[in-house]
């Protein structure tokens, strides 16, 4: 079974197409020639072969260079045709040669670290804030890595001969702070820059176009988009992808084929979902910024469907007060989710480090979905309550916030 890398694959594919078109067709360009409309789901864990010598040669080749085995599939940990379709599609959306999918975003990040560690490049330079578990993985040194935390301006000075990676997240989780990826890539020199693009998605930014060698996604979030699949993926050049495939084979962090199918389907509606949710979020950010019960609103200049805001009252009461919005961790689903980062997503980060990165104890993170914006505002308004106004609040208070604007169409950039 073809995996979609033919006419729509990495080499010799169609002319450059708009993002919306790629989202629908990438990884599927071969289907019509096979008499298919929907992508098939290949659930096989192993594949028959009557030529053991040829199989041995293919396995030896994979062990040597990590290139995907030519010919039919061999074994589920070496690759799966359904997952390969998703990898093809995501790479095209991010503008990279390749993509390698994993069972979760943390499995994907772990594989990146292990690739560099195997080369003796254990030092990582990172900029806070990152997703809480990414922060913990680096800080705790669970995989043998050593991390130096810096401000963006300090990246170049922090590099060492054994630095294998610079890691950033923009917009950042949960503060939505934005970084100049092009300037950071320049500061990295020959050291790979890994940009976590989970919040922005390729609809709003493509880090590879700004010099990032590695683009990380928790595909659980916007790429899947419906809160029913867990996955991670790294979009990158083919050379780095080969090392990632070898690590995936050795450690077993493979993506289930059904998850690969759901992600491929999720990509087809990614642009329209992100733009619609971003429109809702921009409007809610405007209203929150003008609300005297809200101390500060964080909303990125590139737009997006995430809002972070700090309240004067008890943030836990806001969480307890929502009725339409779901009080839950995670993000990027069609329905709206709200959580308290200091209690959940970033609880694992040392409190002083957390606060130093701008994650205050009064900060709430809102993932805006596709509901009607008036219904969402009514729910937020009720959850914020009428008895949580600061003594100094009132007319004339100027909200502290970032610039607010609707996201542009990616095709217009």
UniProtKB/Swiss-Prot annotation:
Binding site for pyridoxal 5'-phosphate: 75-77, 105-106, 218-220
Record PTM N6-(pyridoxal phosphate)lysine, positions in chain: 221
GO molecular function: cystathionine gamma-lyase activity; homocysteine desulfhydrase activity; L-cysteine desulfhydrase activity; methionine gamma-lyase activity; pyridoxal phosphate binding
Entry's EC annotation: 4.4.1.11, 4.4.1.2
Family matches, as SUPFAM superfamilies: PLP-dependent transferases
Gene3D superfamilies reported for this sequence: Aspartate Aminotransferase, domain 1, Type I PLP-dependent aspartate aminotransferase-like (Major domain)
UniProt keyword annotation of Lyase present: yes
Binding site for substrate: 131, 365
Alphabetical list of Pfam families matching this protein: Cys_Met_Meta_PP
A biological process from GO: transsulfuration
Cofactor: pyridoxal 5'-phosphate
Domain of life: Bacteria
Any one cellular-component term (Gene Ontology): cytoplasm
Stretches for region Disordered: 388-413
Catalysis: reaction(s): L-methionine + H2O = methanethiol + 2-oxobutanoate + NH4(+); L-homocysteine + H2O = 2-oxobutanoate + hydrogen sulfide + NH4(+) + H(+); L-cysteine + H2O = hydrogen sulfide + pyruvate + NH4(+) + H(+)
Keyword set, alphabetical order: Lyase, Pyridoxal phosphate
Family: Belongs to the trans-sulfuration enzymes family.
UniProt function note: Catalyzes the alpha,gamma-elimination of L-methionine to produce methanethiol, 2-oxobutanoate and ammonia. Is probably involved in L-methionine catabolism. Is also able to catalyze the alpha,gamma-elimination of L-homocysteine, and, to a lesser extent, the alpha,beta-elimination of L-cysteine.
Subunit structure: Homotetramer; dimer of active dimers.
Protein name: L-methionine gamma-lyase
Annotated source species: Streptomyces avermitilis (strain ATCC 31267 / DSM 46492 / JCM 5070 / NBRC 14893 / NCIMB 12804 / NRRL 8165 / MA-4680)
């Amino acid at each position: 079974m073809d995996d979609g890398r033919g006419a729509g694959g990495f080499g010799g594919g169609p002319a450059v197409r708009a993002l919306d078109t790629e989202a629908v067709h990438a990884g599927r360009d071969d289907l019509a020639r096979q008499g298919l409309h929907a992508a098939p789901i290949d659930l096989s864990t192993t594949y028959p072969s009557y030529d053991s010598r040829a199989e041995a040669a293919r396995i030896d080749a994979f062990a040597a260079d990590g290139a995907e085995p030519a010919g039919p599939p061999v074994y589920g940990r070496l690759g799966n045709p359904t997952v390969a379709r998703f990898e093809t599609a995501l790479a095209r959306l991010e503008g990279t040669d390749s993509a390698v999918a994993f069972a979760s975003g943390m499995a994907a990040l772990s594989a990146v670290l292990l690739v560099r560690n195997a080369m003796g490049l254990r030092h990582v330079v990172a900029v806070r804030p990152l997703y809480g578990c990414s922060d913990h993985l680096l800080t705790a040194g669970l995989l043998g890595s050593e991390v130096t935390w810096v401000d963006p301006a300090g990246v170049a000075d922090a590099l060492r001969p054994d630095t294998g990676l610079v890691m950033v997240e923009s917009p950042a989780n949960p503060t939505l702070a934005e970084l100049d990826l092009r300037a950071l890539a320049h500061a990295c020199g020959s050291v790979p820059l890994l940009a976590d693009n989970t919040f922005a998605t390729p609809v709003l930014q493509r880090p590879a176009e700004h010099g990032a060698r590695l683009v990380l996604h928790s595909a659980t979030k916007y790429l899947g988009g419906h809160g029913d699949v867990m996955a991670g993926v790294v979009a990158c050049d083919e050379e780095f992808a080969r090392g990632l495939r070898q690590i995936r084979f050795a450690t077993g962090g493979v993506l289930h084929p059904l998850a690969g199918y759901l992600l491929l389907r999720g990509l087809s509606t990614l642009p329209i979902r992100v733009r619609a949710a971003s429109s809702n979020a921009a409007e809610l950010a405007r209203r929150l910024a003008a609300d005297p019960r809200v101390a500060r609103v964080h909303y990125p200049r590139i737009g997006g469907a995430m809002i972070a805001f700090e309240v004067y009252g008890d943030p836990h009461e806001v969480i307890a007060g929502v009725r339409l919005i779901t009080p839950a961790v995670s993000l990027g689903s069609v329905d709206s989710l709200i959580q308290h980062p200091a209690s959940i997503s970033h609880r694992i980060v040392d409190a002083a480090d957390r606060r130093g990165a701008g994650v205050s104890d009064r900060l709430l993170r809102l993932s805006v979905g596709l509901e009607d914006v008036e219904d969402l505002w009514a729910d937020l308004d009720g959850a914020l309550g009428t008895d949580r106004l600061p003594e100094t609040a009132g007319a004339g208070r100027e909200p502290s916030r970032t610039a607010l604007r609707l996201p542009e169409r990616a095709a217009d950039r």
